[in-house]
Swiss-Prot record:
Belongs to the papillomaviridae E7 protein family. It comes from Human papillomavirus type 41. This is Protein E7. The gene is E7. One of its GO terms (biological process) is symbiont-mediated suppression of host innate immune response. A zinc finger (unnamed) spans 62-99. The lineage of its organism: Viruses, Monodnaviria, Shotokuvirae, Cossaviricota, Papovaviricetes. A motif (Nuclear export signal) lies at residues 80-88.
Length: 114
């Protein structure tokens, strides 16, 4: 680096698990400046936190027969909160399988729901 700021040409990004071009090709080869162990190198690589995803059992009520509808989804904390807001605060309902089987989609369009 020359000066006080980093030049774009001086930044080299390597995805985790990739071998840089100047790395030793054979496992027996070692470069002279290879003083750090793999563990020290891993500590230096800053890990990007990924959102933790969890299984959730979601329950809703069919607007036609009031049966409880259950499904499982995998979501982050933000994702499950968005789904909750969508199901609770908006005009969105899920129809149960039995109502769809019994009436069909066209039949449900003509029924009143609560």
């Amino acid at each position: 680096m020359r000066g006080n700021s980093v030049d774009l040409q001086e930044i080299v990004l390597v995805q985790q698990g990739e071998v840089p071009e100047n790395a030793a090709v054979h496992s027996g080869e070692h470069s002279d400046d290879e003083g750090e162990s793999e563990e020290e190198e891993r500590e230096q690589v800053q890990q990007v936190p990924t959102p933790r995803r969890t299984l959730y059992l979601v329950e809703s009520q069919c607007p036609f027969c009031q049966a409880i509808i259950r499904f499982v989804c995998v979501a982050s904390n933000t994702g499950i909160r968005n789904l909750q807001a969508l199901l609770v605060n908006s005009h969105l309902d899920l129809a149960c399988h039995a109502c769809v089987e019994q009436n069909g989609v066209q039949g449900l369009r003509h029924r009143q729901w609560q």
